[in-house]
């Protein structure tokens, strides 16, 4: 495919975005439907299964606060004239809500399936590989390699908004909406996966299997801080890290091609880092990549359906 054809394909997809459903003066786009729908879904889930969740009242209050914050951002965003402020308000609100929903999703993992499914993952990987990959990889651990893997794992937090800025300031608001919608939907699909097939993760399920410590420098310290202070048990399959990294990489390919090539070694290393560093099993990472690919493929059709619904609503009104 020629560069012109690739650009045209990206423009066609970006052109799907921008339709707004106005509710009480607030314009909702496709990404907003995903975020607000997820907030409502988790609130309903917590109400129904509150007996199986620790401190459900606190989670409901947090969801209410997040909802007010997000709706407030939707109210103020169109009134901003400065492009930088518009970017930070829009992107910051979506990405903050995704991060907060991840923390809430971790608390709801065992409400349907009541036990961790790590033994099933271990059995599958033993049958496929003959070894447990996360344990087998210990023979390759060195401080420099650990530091690089930790860099790839944590720099994702910078790429997340950074790529959004590149897309926005080079291509405009509609391509940014494509990026944000796909990120939001991928996150939510991963969160649902946590409940359908809850997996504790190798670090929590079998810590005794790891006899070689993960030593490195600054990024290793940063990564371990995230593991011990932000991550909780679970949140494993599909791997949100691999899923979101795939979305970022493919969106770079669609809108900012030089960034796609520049990110290649980082994203490929990130995939490996998730199980090399014992955050995930190899299976989690593969499922995360496949989840992102599926979401990317179906997103244009979903946005088209959103647009049709908005137009029907406008006609009926």
Where are these regions (language model features)?
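Interfacial segments of alpha-helical transmembrane regions
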Residues: 88-95, 161-197, 263
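Transmembrane alpha-helix/helix-exit interface in multi-pass inner-membrane proteins
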Residues: 103-119, 186-212
